[in-house]
Amino acid sequence: MDSLLILKGGYMLLGLDVGGTFTDAVIIDAHRVVATAKRRTTKDNLMNGIGEALDAVLEGYDTSNIEQVTLSTTVVTNTIVEAKEQVVDLYVITGPGRNVDDIFPVEPIYLQGYTDHRGIVVECTPADAVRGIANMVQARSGTDLAAVSAKFGVRNPQEELSITEELKNTYHTISNGSLLSGSLNFPRRTISAYFNSAVTPVFTVFKKNVEDALSARNILAPLHILKADGGSLPMEHMVSRPVETAFTGPAATVLGLSALGVIGNKHTVALDIGGTTTDISLWKHGKPLMTKNGVSIREYPSAVRSFAVTSVGIGGESVIRLKNGNLTVGPERVGPSVALGGVEPTLGDALIVLGHANYGDFNLASRALQDLADAIQATLQSKNVNTSNNQLTLIKTASDVARLIVEKALQTIQHGINEVVKVENKRPIYVVADIVNPDVFVPEHIVVVGGTAPNLGPSIGEYLELPVTIPENAAVANAIGAALALSTIELTIHVDTKRRLLVIPELGIKQQNCTLKRAEQVVERAKEVLSEEALRLGLDTAQEIEVINIEDFPVVEGWQSMERLITVKVQLAAGVKHYVE
């Protein structure tokens, strides 16, 4: 153990991934994973599981050598999925056009005013009216959380920001749609703003608890948190935009796969098999696929950028039940495998009985599955069950039922992969190159990570008849991904050359007398502003800046095209700091 105290490279990265079943922690020194820990996630109080994982992974290490801590957490995801978010008063400025009564999570409060597609304020929102309405609405709701979103607010955030100033006298937390996303799509921005305010209280408490836990262990390194788009940012900054930390589990998986260097350039299906679910992601030419416009939060489409990841209800602790003469595997999880002291048999128990896993008590797992086999035989003898072509008629022993359990799990995973591939191959084509040279996704390679990867991964490869890779440290891939995540921020600059107007919605900036005339000039300005913002946040200013999108439209007036509408979106390139050995 003493040898661990002398670490090559001097500085270490600590990664934490709070999953639905397990909380993982890793320490990375240079390009080596030098310590790992896996502890059960304590849903009633996440900090208990986080504390246990920290204590386990830090044993024998000098915490003063930790350079950065990066966390991937389910706290926001759980709040949203379980519908436990706080009440939010949602204010919208829609102007004419589409009826939005039924597309938001709550009934919005409509405010007078209108900004057109060029960013021209056609009708101002009266300040005194906002104050009066806010007092009345807040008295009824009793909440101190609000969200504000205006149609075409990304073209001119003036109305959103002025309304926010008026609401500060009434509400403690206010989110703006245009500050969260610079992209056109009023409904998505509005939904993001609503959920951003709704999860702020729980995120703020969680942030304080994590900071206290690190402080108690003498960890003074900067604390970052992973975002759904695979980037990380300082926890302090994310207090104003916690909705972006939802669904970070898939992001951690994707980054972990990148860091482990196992994807290659083939069409690859990556599986992260946890205790409850299997996350499926597709990779083309070494890059993961992203959602087109943003991730859906419950049934509501948001502006939060995310990797395209789909989950199916199969995990190591998927419960096994006999229902109406049928054997089901998942999607529910009720606790640990019987081999680990649980009360109902799981997929993990089946893997233990078949010799694919060697944890826990084999005898307990075998006895539980034998009891299930006996129950199946008793059910088949009932006159109420149709035994024709029923697989259950062959079940006699614990091994028989274990094989059937694994087969059903593999069928569910295969179906999930087929559906994801089908959706990908039906995506709309936007450029001529994709018509001339279509890149149809045909799986060529499977990569499996997650706690159940070593136990189920080989069977998946055999079942799908594809080569399968299970990397070293597959069980803690998500924590590795979190530890190595690069910082990312995204900015949008919109320039109207006729009006000499420059707008940066994410920063709430509106500048008159802009002299930029060409797209190349706007790109350079965007890079300059992004570098300045990165410096302000204490990020690595040497990191590559990526131009995500350029839109350049001529403005035709009097049969002449003299002016332009130019929109440029840039970001610090997402990815990992380096590979691990």
Predicted regions and their residues:
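N-terminally biased helix-coil "hinge/interface" segments that flank
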Residues: L4-E581
